[in-house]
Amino acid sequence: MKALIKRYPDYGIWMEDVPMPEVGVNDVLIKVKKAAICGTDLHMYKWDAWSQAHCKPPYTMGHEFVGEVVEIGPGVRNIKVGERVTAEGHIVCGHCRNCRRGMGHVCENTISVGIMGKDGCFAEYVTIPESNVVKLNPAIPDDFAAIMDPFGNATHTALAFPLLGEDVLITGAGLIGTMAAGICRYAGAKHVVVTDINEMRLDIAKKMGATLTVNGAKGETVEWAMQKLGIKGFDVGLEMSGAPAAFNDMIEHMYKGANIAQLGILPADTQVNWSDVIFNALTIKGITGRRMWETWYQMEQMLLGGLDLSPVITHRFKFDDFQKGFDVMVSGQCGKVLLEME
């Protein structure tokens, strides 16, 4: 079968013919229909410092997909051949302290599909443990099913705190930030302001329901947005950028007693004015992955309730044209990029 392999510890990714994956005990073999390129895939493609520290080539990349079950291994009880599925990309042990207290998303022994320890879905076929396979409601289209993984990150972050009637500041208009804007509006936020320096991505944020967008590259400021909306601060902050300046700008413009959900990965040497955090009684909550399985139930219900993710999907390429997909990701002038196997 064809697969995209991170063959060497170097810039790039390579298409190769590889053997079909073996179907082991409790495994489900899935024929991939569509896969999506993630920001993490871009890190591995570039072979940056994070990838060098966490990933060990060779391996098949990819962890966002939708497909059809074509074979089940011994022990599989609840998944049937022919079912349309996606998967939770974090394979957890189920036995560590965190798993046993209902916090599998921070399992001490996590294996990440297509990243660390398990070949991924940038291939014609992929095996996933039954415990991680997610059956899909027929009303959820393939395009949305293929991006449930990052939609889950956005959902986990956006719903970390109550939103109904609240003013929300989102720093970072990447895929997760723009989806979070839609979630916030769906959940009843009063105003949603999104900041970034990429006008194309801010346009996507507007399509997803942002009340106002702030482009720092044009000299626009959060203060300008607050003045225009007639507000003096924000109740909820969703930090998606990982940019120290954006994080500190957020802290400066929160109401006292406000809440911040932090998904963006800040540099280790980030300087923070902790006095503002302490004396303004701010709560900062770190976010990783998706809660298993509450986040998945929330995602499904929002999609069935009419939340439209189509504005975030900007490019589609055939699997053989994967290089075009990675090129547009490198350019930054895109939302979500899909690779279509069929």
Predicted features along the sequence, with ranges:
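Acidic carboxylate diad motif detector
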Residues: 263-264
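C-terminal substrate-binding/catalytic core of Rossmann-like NAD(P)-dependent dehydrogenases/reductases
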Residues: 223-227, 231, 267-315, 323-324, ...
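N-terminal glycine-rich cofactor-binding segment
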Residues: 3-22, 39-71, 86, 107-119
